[in-house]
Amino acid sequence: VLDFSTASLTGAAFTSLLMRDRIARADAVPAEAKGTPHLPVKAKRVIHLCLCGGVSHIDSFDYKPELEKFHGKSLQSEERPATFFNQVGLIRKNDWEFKQRGQSGLWVSDLFPHIAEVADELTVVRSMVAESANHTPATFEENTGFRLNGFPVMGAWVSYGLGCETDELPSYVVLPDGRGLPAGGTINWSNGFLPAQHQGVTFQSQGPPIYDLFPSRELPVGSDLASRKLLEEINRRHLAVTGTEDALLARMKSYELAAKMQLAVPDVTDLKQETEATRLMYGLDKEETSDFGSR
C-alpha cells in the first residue's frame, strides 16, 4: 500500500495539485509551468497497464515460426541473453497458434481471441528490449527508459505533456494491484526531476479510494478550518526565516484544496453510478474480474 506523507493528507496528491494551482494563477508564467501542453495534442488521456512478469511476447503478438523448428534444442549462439545464475534453458515453441488478423494482418495468438477482433485498432511495437533480467531494474527501464531510479516515469511525462483538465483531481493517477506493489515499489510512479505535480497519486480499488483523505473521526464544526489556518501561519513564519520554497508553499495550500478532493473523489470513484452495460463490459459483478474491472 502506498502512503504519500499522510501528515498532510496524502501530501504528494495535494502538493501536486497545489503547485499547479498556485502557478496557474500567477501572472506571466511560461505555458509549461502552468501544466498546459507545449504543442497541440490529439490525445486526451493515456492508460498504461504495467504488467510485471506479464504474458510472454512470443505467446501474444510476436510470432516467431522458427521456434518450432528448434523446439527442445539448446541455444546455438555466441550471444548469450542476460539470465539468473548464467543458466539458459531450452528453446520452446509458441504454446498457442498464431493467425493474421484484420485487414492489417497483425499476428495475434489464439490466447487473445477478443483482442484479435480489434486488431486493426492496435499498434504493436516489437523493437523494445530490456537490458536486465532482474525484475526491478527491468521494470524501471520499462517505465522510465533507464535501469536506475531517479528518472520520470512514463505517466509523469504524459502528465507533463498533456497537462490536466481539472484542479480537483491529479493529472496522473495510479491504480495499484491489491496483491502488492511492483518490483521497485512506489518509485515506478515517481516524477523524478519533473515538477511535483507530475508524480502519480494512488487510488485504491477496495476500501477508501485515497488513504487519509478524510479524518478518522468526526471533527467539531470549524475545527478543521482553524487547524488549517494555524498550520498556514506556522509555515509562513518558517518561510520568513528560510526564504522561498516551492514544496512548502505548495503544502501550505494542501488543506485548502483537500476540501475540493473530499467532494470530487467520492463522486468519481462511486462505481454504483455506472450503467448496467458498463458494469457488464468491465466485469464488475463477476468475482474473477471485479477487482481488475474496478480499477
Tell where the protein language model's regions lie, with residue ranges.
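Ligand-binding pockets and gating/stacking loops
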Residues: 1-295
